[in-house]
């Protein structure tokens, strides 16, 4: 119906289409692809397309032809065409109206043209019969062709529609659906999800990997670095331990204990570092062959009394007044006789002056043979030149028996108040040491175990060697 509507509209719009339709309506409609069109369809469509158009009740094709001719000014041509053209356009109406000459003329005009007309004119009734037969055949053929063409055309249209709808729908819907949905979903979601997920996961893992190498690795490295930092702090603590050597209080427990012992030596004017050297090196030499001299180390810790005796082997004339000093007296007695510690002539710590220790304290801790600047005493028979106190371990391994002389009467010296050594706890800061002030004496100074003043040491002249008498065979001199 759409094609019929468009064709009728074209008849009123195009002069060429109208001229062809007025000259031969059936051929023009067949050329336009309009086959097997009923008269009532033409009447209905024409009435709807051209409002007010009246095609008449008899023949809608003739009415349409006259209306188109009147629209374009083809009225004369329509009058000259006559019935034959009209019959050629509508075969069914021609057969119904006039089966004789109308069928033959219409048949010749419609299908054979001028030849058909000549054949009909020469053949007469026979031609009409033949024409009728031909018409029947043509009608049959036309009907078959129309039906087949309509079915094929409709089928083609349906196929086209199916192809268009199904193809476009399937291709568009499925293709676009699959392409859009599958492609979009798979490409977008899968690629996006997988790409973003994998990219995000992998990227995230890359970040974790970098963070794992960077963050986790940095955390591990930071932990290891932290442990290394702790180790470096231990290294710093080791450096602090080195600082503790220079510090009296020290930083570690061992250095602190050593510095407590050196503080006691500091009462005798020792420097903290030299006191550590004395306690570290001098005491093992004293405690080797002289068993029990280690008590002297404790006496030294009690106030440095052990440092006040036995300067280069000569004991002080004043005996100790305290109980602890008595222990020191025993110690210095052994040290005064020169017990032979590694060939040394003096213990290296007894009686040393504070100023001398400031320069020679380091040597006391490392050198075995220290004589404190005095000529060593020869190991032999020594005549007593004053009150001497000899220990039981004098000489070489106690070979000579101890000889005790009564000391000369001495005026009791005024004992100086003894300040106990302050116990130093481990501290980070180095304590400030104030120099020891010399004590004020009301009476002439006497050599005491607690006298730690800075008086110059008494110069002792070594005793003159005496030739020993030779003993005879019977042990009497001169024989």
Curated annotation (Swiss-Prot):
Chain intervals for the UniProt region annotation (Disordered): 417-464
InterPro entries, per database record:
IniB-like_N (IPR049709)
Alphabetical list of NCBIfam families matching this protein: IniB_NTERM
Protein name according to UniProt: Isoniazid-induced protein IniB
Native organism is Mycobacterium tuberculosis (strain CDC 1551 / Oshkosh)
């Amino acid at each position: 119906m759409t094609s019929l509507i468009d064709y009728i509209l074209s008849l009123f719009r195009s002069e060429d289409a109208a001229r062809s339709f007025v000259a031969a309506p059936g051929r023009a409609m067949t050329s336009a692809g309009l086959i097997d069109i009923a008269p009532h369809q033409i009447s209905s469509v024409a009435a709807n397309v051209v409002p007010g158009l009246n095609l008449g009740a008899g023949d809608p094709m003739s009415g349409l032809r006259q209306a188109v001719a009147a629209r374009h000014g083809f009225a004369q041509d329509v009058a000259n065409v006559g019935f034959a053209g009209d019959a050629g356009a509508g075969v069914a109406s021609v057969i119904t109206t006039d089966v004789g000459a109308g069928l033959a003329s219409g048949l010749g005009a419609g299908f054979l043209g001028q030849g058909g007309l000549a054949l009909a004119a020469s053949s007469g009734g026979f031609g009409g019969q033949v024409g009728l037969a031909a018409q029947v055949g043509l009608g049959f053929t036309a009907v078959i062709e129309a039906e087949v063409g309509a079915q094929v055309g409709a089928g083609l249209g349906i196929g086209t529609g199916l192809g268009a709808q199904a193809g476009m729908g399937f291709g568009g819907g499925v293709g676009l659906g699959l392409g859009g949905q599958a492609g979009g979903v798979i490409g977008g979601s899968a690629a996006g999800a997988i790409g973003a997920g994998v990219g995000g996961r992998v990227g995230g893992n890359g970040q974790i990997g970098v963070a794992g190498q960077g963050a986790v690795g940095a955390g591990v490295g930071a932990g290891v670095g932290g442990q290394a930092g702790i180790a470096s702090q231990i290294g710093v603590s080791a450096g602090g331990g080195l600082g503790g050597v220079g510090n009296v209080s020290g930083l570690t427990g061992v250095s602190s204990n050593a510095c407590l012992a050196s503080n006691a030596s500091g009462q005798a004017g020792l420097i903290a570092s030299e006191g550590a050297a004395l306690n570290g090196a001098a005491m093992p030499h004293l405690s080797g062959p002289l068993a029990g001299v280690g008590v002297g180390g404790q006496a030294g810790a009690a106030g440095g009394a052990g440092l006040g005796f036995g300067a280069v082997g000569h004991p002080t004339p004043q005996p100790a007044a305290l109980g602890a000093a008595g222990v020191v007296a025993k110690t210095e007695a052994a040290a005064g006789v020169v017990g032979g510690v590694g060939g040394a002539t003096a213990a290296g710590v007894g009686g040393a002056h504070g100023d001398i220790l400031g320069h020679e304290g380091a040597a006391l801790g490392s050198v075995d043979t220290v004589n404190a600047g005095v000529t060593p005493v020869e190991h032999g028979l020594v005549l007593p030149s004053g009150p001497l106190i000899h220990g039981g371990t004098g000489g070489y391994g106690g070979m000579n028996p101890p000889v005790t002389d009564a000391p000369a009467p001495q005026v009791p010296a005024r004992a100086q108040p003894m300040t106990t050594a302050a116990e130093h706890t481990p501290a980070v800061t180095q304590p400030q040491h104030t120099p020891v002030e010399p004590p004020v004496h009301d009476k002439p100074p006497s050599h005491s175990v607690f006298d730690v003043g800075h008086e110059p040491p008494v110069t002792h002249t070594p005793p003159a060697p005496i030739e020993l008498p030779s003993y005879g065979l019977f042990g009497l001199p001169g024989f």
